[in-house]
């Protein structure tokens, strides 16, 4: 990329933390700040966030990152051209447009409280859990925003009353942040982008607008929904009271779509982001592909109001890095997440132990809300290193399950190979710093894994979207620059095919052991 003065900022609002990163014209991070926030677990299977705490975390991250950039000699004042925003998807907020206050804590994407609503709809609607797939690409599941919104409408009196009074508005985290950053109760913009909207189960994938039949079927009033915009356009300006008033918000994507853009994935290329969960997306180009193997049809990105829409197949895994957090916080096997690599490397195998982290059920490609976690194959020989390695393997097995489904769905309709005839999985996210995890992934797939120099591509993707909208970058800068690829690390498979097949068969047996466990009682 040609050098040019100026910077792009990126808000990365994730499941467990918020970050703000400032990039220069060469897409290099020059400063960043990260803040963790509180996770609430009011009941088994429930996960909530405080929207006000998230809002404050964004303010703090912006201010601190600006201070760091200035302290390091970067002329950010007057040089920040725009900001992009990426967020945890599906997490649902309903708030009062008159007071600006949330009417309930945010219900997080992995929250499973809506299982009874899902079962009810599956029985009532033709096609069962696939009733809405034709229009929105998604099955009926606790995962998506529509079910969370229905729960709030049915169970929270403040939400019911506000809807009756015309005072309630709904949004995912991007909508909540943009509304507050552009004025809040004083004219804040009520918008979302096409990728976040595609995860609500309410947007028609072909028209990219709210699906009126779906709204009618579910009884959701259209007036509480935000306007849908593309991923790369000037949405509005940041209001007074924020560290960067007057700066344009020019890009917005859900986190996994941002990572795909950050990895510059073209048609036929896939990426896997390893975070709290793991999310694998395959860019299928301009035509949505309907999955017959447990995947979701969704958007990849739309880089401008008049730009073509790129679609994707997605496999969403609920628990990946969260299993490592569980080892740390609940079992005390490790003191920090980074310790798991050395602990797992103390043994050459799991010793026959298989761990399936179905804490709140299983997502793609199994879609079993009745599943619960299991750890099998334990003997007196088993020690904590075997458990740690089994946890790492569980992340990789789940990714392989999704990739196998992608190959079945898209193998004939879209290329899954590069010019050398091999499949490459591009990876990103904090957990990919774990070299052992990446080698296990390559071994279990039997294919190379490519890790970029900057593994936090989610924030980079949001920055790219904003930079494109204001002319800071061109698409060629993103999709044709080979500089990042030159420095990528490639992990190649070293496991014998016979061993791989045996391990995969054992994993599938372990997964089956998780089924029908949700109703177990003491």
Curated annotation (Swiss-Prot):
Pathway annotation: Polyol metabolism; glycerol degradation via glycerol kinase pathway; sn-glycerol 3-phosphate from glycerol: step 1/1
List the catalytic activities from the record: glycerol + ATP = sn-glycerol 3-phosphate + ADP + H(+)
Q: Give the subcellular location.
A: Cytoplasm, Cytosol
The UniProt GO MF terms for this protein read:
ATP binding; glycerol kinase activity
What main location does UniProt list? cytoplasm
Under what conditions is it induced? By the bacterial pathogens P.syringae pv. phaseolicola, pv. syringae, pv. tomato and pv. tabaci, and flagellin.
CDD domains registered for this protein in UniProt? ASKHA_NBD_FGGY_GK1-3-like
Chain positions recorded as substrate binding sites: 15, 89-90, 143, 255-256
Which InterPro entries does the entry mention?
A: ATPase_NBD, Carb_kinase_FGGY, Carb_kinase_FGGY_CS, FGGY_C, FGGY_N, GK1-3_metazoan-type, Glycerol_kin
Keywords, A to Z, come to: ATP-binding, Cytoplasm, Glycerol metabolism, Kinase, Nucleotide-binding, Plant defense, Transferase
Entry's Gene Ontology BP terms: defense response to bacterium; glycerol catabolic process; glycerol-3-phosphate metabolic process; response to bacterium; response to microbial phytotoxin; response to molecule of bacterial origin
GO cellular component, as recorded: cytosol
What happens biologically when this protein's gene is inactivated, per the record? Answer: No visible phenotype under normal growth conditions, but mutant plants accumulate high levels of glycerol, can grow on synthetic medium containing glycerol and have increased resistance to salt, cold, osmotic and drought stresses.
Query: What is the E.C. number?
Result: 2.7.1.30
**Superkingdom as given in the UniProt entry:** Eukaryota
**Tissues showing expression:** Highly expressed in germinating seeds and senescent leaves, and at lower levels in roots, leaves, flowers and siliques.
**Do the record's keywords include S-adenosyl-L-methionine?**
no
Q: Does the keyword Signal apply?
A: no
- List positions binding ATP: 19, 276, 321, 430-434
**Which Gene3D superfamilies does the UniProt record give?**
3.30.420.40
The protein's role, per its UniProt record: Key enzyme in the regulation of glycerol uptake and metabolism. Required for resistance to nonhost Pseudomonas bacteria and to the pathogenic fungus B.cinerea.
Q: Which family does it belong to?
A: Belongs to the FGGY kinase family.
User: Mind telling me which NCBIfam families this protein's record contains?
Assistant: glycerol_kin, PRK00047.1
Name of protein: Glycerol kinase
Organism from which the protein derives: Arabidopsis thaliana (Mouse-ear cress)
